[in-house]
Amino acid sequence: MLLASLDPSALTATDIADAVRIEGAVLSRSDLVGAATSVAERVGGAGRVAILAAPTAATVLAVTGCLIAGVPFVPVPADVGAAERRHMLTDSGVQAWLGPVPDESEGLPHIPVRLHARSWHRYAEPSPDATAMIIYTSGTTGLPKGVVLSRRAIAADLDALAQAWQWTADDVLVHGLPLFHVHGLVLGLLGSLRIGNRFIHTGKPTPQGYAQAATEHGGTLFFGVPTVWSRVGADETAARALRPARLLVSGSAPLPVPVFDRLAGLTGHQPIERYGASESLITLSTRADGERRPGWVGLPLSGVRTRVVDDEGALVPHDGETVGKLHVRGPMMFDGYLNQPDATAEAFDADGWYRTGDVAVIDAEGMHRIVGRESVDLIKSGGYRIGAGEIETVLLGHPGVAEAAVVGMPDADLGQRIVAFVVGSAPGDELIDYVAQELSVHKRPREVRIVDALPRNAMGKVLKKRLLTDG
């Protein structure tokens, strides 16, 4: 059963305790089963539905109701632009909105979610191979693509993470992340409903919200993106409030080493770092009982295999330095891109390995470090293959740098020249010399551009292609 903690036959008198806290609403496990089953009765039989995925109790019940009824859903960001929303609705072929609707509903009918309605009808568990949801990618390379995720893939990933993080029903999981991405929706919400722990959504991922969840509700497992953890680390009072926690988990973008170190110093916890994508879910992570090395995303999860290859497809040595293209495979892979068979075929090689599009290194112990995106983070300059992330890490260690992003700009002589975009007060010449001293001369930026802010998406990832085109 995908949502194992919501098995009606397993509910007991103790299930009157709160299972989910979100937007001021408190839902017990019994509330979740009764209200979500009522949603399932209204949505049952639909082909696909859209859910406006704001952090609300209605979203929780809509998602849960769809999974009970076996109806695939499309989580739609509440702040998405009209053109992108129209594409998602048209491409997915959804038949209705479930729950609240945006101002522009595109003429689709509306199925309400009633928080106080209850039904105790028993639904048969859908096939593990059935589609659970279609998550649209960020669209950095064109219109967003619909990633088709099966119930089997989600269950396999959550079980592997539970093993890696020693995640149990005794945990209290806290985050304030969006409910339209893998991080907040699949790991945070569905993970809690599968494992049976309490789930607290803070509305927004603020240091104060996380601290309050720790002190008032006994939060043990906190999820955040690097931007969140940077802000927590800048608020000493909030950071120290997380000392009783069990794990701080960072993902969706690389965690800067200075942020890792500051969190460890203030909270007493070295953050867990993990790696994944909408297409593969989470495939790599450091362990609750294992080594946590700043800048490294750990070992393959149970059932996952990885390899790093060069441009000719040959395996690169596991020496912790040689950069190559990261391929993964495992039971949590997506079923393909909706309506895009050519893109799906291109995503996998002839042997069934998923081409992540990221470049990485593996060391002798099997630990993985993500260098970045093959398209923007692997810089080929003067005959060298240079990872942008390595340079960014060094720049962030300079006291005059708050944020940094490194790209390779076209260059007639070098092929690509290294350009650093920096938020901070340090002079560019000083930063160039600093990198040359810390790494090597050929890895130094040829140019440093001081900017007020770096362009980022909703999950905090720097939009490097925008830097390349607009920079």
For each feature predicted by the language model, list its residue ranges.
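N-lobe entry segment of adenylate-forming
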Residues: 1-47, 69, 212, 428, ...
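Conserved pre-ATP/AMP-binding loop-to-beta segment of ANL
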Residues: 4, 11-16, 118-136, 143, ...
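Conserved beta-loop-beta connector loops within the AMP-binding
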Residues: 307-327, 346, 364-365, 426-428, ...
